[in-house]
């Protein structure tokens, strides 16, 4: 299975512009699937990059967390990317086309709900 993974900035209007490169969304074939964030631990340790998936594959995801990794840590953003790809490929294989369709439908529902809320707020 060939997938297209893309990183995009999570915040376009971050209150601290110097933090813009610390928060990324992970898209798979154009659909949001997770986050990649620069994490600063204790001051005596270097920061690391932490990623995790936010998937909603319905019943097709039952047992996914026990069977595979849906999160990880890497020393650099570039080092995290191959791990994210491997984990995403395994996750998609586990949930199958039905699980992926359930996730895409869930994300479309969230987008529609957000848009409806935005329209309601603009009328008030």
Q: Language-model segments: what does each one mean?
A:
Residues 1-3, 11, 59, 63, ...:
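Amphipathic, alpha-helical segments enriched in basic
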Residues 102-108:
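Post-kinase regulatory C-tail/linker adjacent to protein kinase catalytic domains
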Residues 1-50, 81-82, 89-90, 97, ...:
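Short N-terminal "domain-start" leader segments
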Residues 55-82, 86-93:
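A short, exposed loop/beta-hairpin motif centered on an aromatic-Gly-Thr core
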Residues 96-102:
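A short alpha-helix capping/helix-loop junction motif
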């Amino acid at each position: 299975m060939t997938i297209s993974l893309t990183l995009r900035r999570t915040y376009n209007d971050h209150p601290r512009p110097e933090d813009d490169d610390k928060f990324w969304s992970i898209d798979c074939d154009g659909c949001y699937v997770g986050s990649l964030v620069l994490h600063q631990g204790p001051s005596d340790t270097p920061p690391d990059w932490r990623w995790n998936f936010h998937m909603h594959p319905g019943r097709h995801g039952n047992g996914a967390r026990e069977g595979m990794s849906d999160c990880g840590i890497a020393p650099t953003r570039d080092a995290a990317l191959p791990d994210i790809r491997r984990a995403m490929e395994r996750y998609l294989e586990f949930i199958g086309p039905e699980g992926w369709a359930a996730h895409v439908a869930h994300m479309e529902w969230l987008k529609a709900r957000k848009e409806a809320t935005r329209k309601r707020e603009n009328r008030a």
